[in-house]
């Protein structure tokens, strides 16, 4: 069986419900519907990428985001960077055969031995540093000079900065390795990935055959 590549989306889904992760990332038998919110998020990320990297003015309807982009004008920003990491913690290509984990970082600002990570968010606020910490250990794998990591989400819909997180990439990586060990065990033994009931089951999960699903 083809090995699973770790990513924030996969790990977040697997931790919440392995069964949903199996249907979404292994069987790939769930319908994909690109919602208007998803389309908007893609347009916003594309516009902010051009604004931060090339100083291209933001399009109509995104003017309120200018203050967040302008705050980065005098900093050495790496924008929409695709990163890969091996199982041994070394940097590698995003699509390399030995990639264990991959991610795309909205904005990274390295300076001396520290790095600030900015992640644009167009959805509802959820101050969980997990995604930022995953970016941190992938950035470190590709730049061993960096030691300290800080991160912020920018909640664009609410027009505000999120809280500053002091990131712990080591603790996050150790946890993620344990999760991926569970994935490997499930794949090795060919058993069904278990369903974990959670707050999203009743109204939001697309795995309609699951006993916890409320959308049937």
How should these model regions be labeled?
Residues 13-14, 25-26, 47, 51, ...:
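Residues that form generic nucleotide/phosphate-binding pockets
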Residues 1-3, 19-32, 114-117, 180-191:
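Short amphipathic alpha-helical segments and their helix-coil junctions
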Residues 43-117, 123-130, 141-156, 164-165:
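Catalytic cores of nuclease domains that cleave nucleic-acid phosphodiester backbones
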Residues 30, 34, 38, 122-126, ...:
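Short, charged/polar micro-motifs that form catalytic or ligand-binding hotspots
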């Amino acid at each position: 069986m083809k090995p699973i590549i770790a990513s924030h989306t996969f790990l977040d889904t697997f931790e919440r419900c392995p069964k949903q992760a199996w249907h979404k990332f292994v069987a790939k038998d769930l319908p994909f519907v690109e919602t208007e919110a998803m389309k908007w998020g893609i347009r916003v990320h594309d516009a902010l990428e051009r604004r931060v990297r090339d100083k291209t003015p933001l399009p109509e309807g995104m003017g309120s985001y200018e203050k967040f982009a302008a705050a980065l004008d005098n900093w050495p920003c790496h924008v929409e960077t695709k990163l890969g990491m091996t199982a041994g913690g070394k940097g590698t290509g995003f699509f390399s055969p030995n990639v264990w984990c991959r991610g795309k970082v909205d904005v990274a600002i390295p300076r001396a031995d520290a790095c600030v990570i900015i992640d644009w968010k167009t959805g509802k606020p959820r101050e969980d540093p997990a995604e930022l910490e995953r970016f941190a250990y992938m950035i470190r794998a590709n730049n061993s000079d960096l030691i300290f990591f800080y991160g912020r989400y920018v909640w664009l819909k609410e027009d505000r900065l999120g809280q500053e997180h002091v990131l712990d990439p080591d603790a996050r990586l150790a946890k993620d390795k344990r999760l991926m060990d569970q994935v490997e065990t499930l794949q090795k033994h060919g058993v069904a990935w278990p369903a974990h009931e959670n707050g999203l089951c009743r109204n939001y999960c697309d795995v309609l055959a699951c006993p916890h699903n409320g959308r049937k």
